[in-house]
Structure formats: C-alpha cells, structure tokens
Regions:
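Carbohydrate-binding surfaces of carbohydrate-active enzymes
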Residues: 1-244
C-alpha cells in the first residue's frame, strides 16, 4: 500500500519468476559470476600529474611574483586534460607517490621540493621516463625556505638549463611562443602564454620554441633534453591549453 505500492521490483504483485524483469536480473547475476576474475583488478595508469596540496599552500602564501593569482590549479588541469585527450589514463599524485610505474610524469609548478624529491624526479627520467617540468619549479624546500645553488634545484643537469628570472604579466598582457624550424615534436604554430614567463639560461638542452616578443624575445620557452634512458621537457611559461 501507500505511495510505493507500484514501485518497480524484481518480483511484482503477480509473484512469479516468469516475467521479463526477473529474467533480465537473473542474466545480470549470471554475467557477474563470469566476471569474478576481473573483479578487484586494477588498470595501471601510464601517466601521472603532480598536484600536491602542500605545494599549493606554499604557492598561495608566497608574496609575488603575482599577488593575485598564480594559476597553479589551472596549470595542473591543462596537463591533465592534454594527457586524457591522448586517450591515456592519468593518476593525480602527491610528492609522496612512487613514480616507478609510470611512463610519463608531468609536474607543473612544483615550487616546493620535499626532501629528496629532486632525486626521485631525476631517477624517473634516468630509468626511461618522460618528465615534464615547468616554470616556478624547485625554489623552496618542505619548510618553504629558499633552496640555494640555482633552480630548478637539483635538476639543472637533468633539464639542461638554469632559471634566471621570471616576468609576471598583468592580466591583460600576453606573449607567445614561436617554434624552432625542424623541431622534433613537429610543432608548427605559435601559442599564447600569459601570467608567468620564465627566463632561462640553456646549457645543453635543445630549444624547441622561443618567446616572440618583449625584452626576452628569442629566449627559450620550451626545451628538451635526453637524460639517461628518458626525456625531460621544460615549459618556461604559462602556455594556453592548445599548446599541450
């Protein structure tokens, strides 16, 4: 009786087992039995994107180079979306996560390096992984104290460059990247960058794109270095989604 007296059920008011619903539910049960070996199994993602909460807090707390918004979350989302659009399963991980099972790791704006994290990233690339780093990486330790000796800390050899300074753009300002002719990624178009543009000094990295204007026109905006058995890419600016 009451409001649910005509609510759908496996067995209706007729009470028999020769109804369509009963038969279809039975078929579902039989199919689930056949899937017992699959139940509990996992699909290992080949790619991961670093999103670390403590890193986010540290970026939010820093005074400069932009006081309004550093767009850390958006930087993570851009790389996550790019990997998903390639049909890859992607894990979102913190700095405590082991990297050895991945083929690709993107660590955008890894401003804070917990103790030994730079070694973990180096080892990942040395062992054959593809590592994507960006501007504003490896500046402070786990207590938010500046790391000395150059940035990205502990990774300058791996990326083949050292960061020198960073240009904070107003919200209405833009720059753009121009691809090098014959670059191995086959990049042909120009791409807009906003908010943060890092200036780097290349040692032995391959320059794939350069800034198109301002006082740093012609300086690298995208680099690559073969490191160990793997590859390290460094994105020097906050590039638009289409770039990825």
């Amino acid at each position: 009786g009451a409001s649910e007296k005509f609510h759908g059920a496996v067995i209706d008011h007729y009470g028999g087992d020769d109804t369509r619903v009963f038969k279809e539910v039975t078929e579902v049960g039989e199919a689930l039995v056949k899937l017992q070996e699959v139940c509990g199994s996992q699909m290992k993602a080949p790619a991961a994107v670093l999103y670390d909460r403590e890193n986010n807090w540290a970026i939010q707390d820093v005074q400069g180079p932009r006081n309004e918004n550093m767009f850390y979350t958006e930087a993570v989302q851009k790389q996550y979306r790019a990997l998903r659009e390639q049909g890859l399963n992607v894990d979102v991980i913190s700095m405590e996560h082991d990297l050895s099972d991945y083929k690709i790791v993107a660590a955008p704006m890894a401003y804070m390096f917990l103790d030994g994290y730079e070694k973990q990233l180096r080892t990942f690339a040395e062992n054959g992984g593809t590592l994507v780093l960006t501007y504003w990486s490896g500046l402070v330790d786990g207590t938010d104290k500046c790391l000395l000796g150059g940035t990205p800390y502990g990774l300058m050899e791996a990326v083949g460059l050292r960061t020198e300074e960073i240009d904070a753009l107003y919200d209405w300002e833009e720059n753009f990247g121009i691809p090098e002719n014959g670059n191995h990624l086959g990049i042909t178009g120009t791409y807009t960058c906003k908010n943060l543009c890092e200036l780097v000094k290349v040692s032995d990295a391959e320059v794939l794109m350069r800034y198109g204007k301002d006082f740093y026109a012609g300086r690298p905006v995208l680099t690559h270095k073969a490191y160990g058995k793997g590859h390290v890419y460094y994105v020097c600016a906050d590039m638009e989604q289409a770039f990825y």
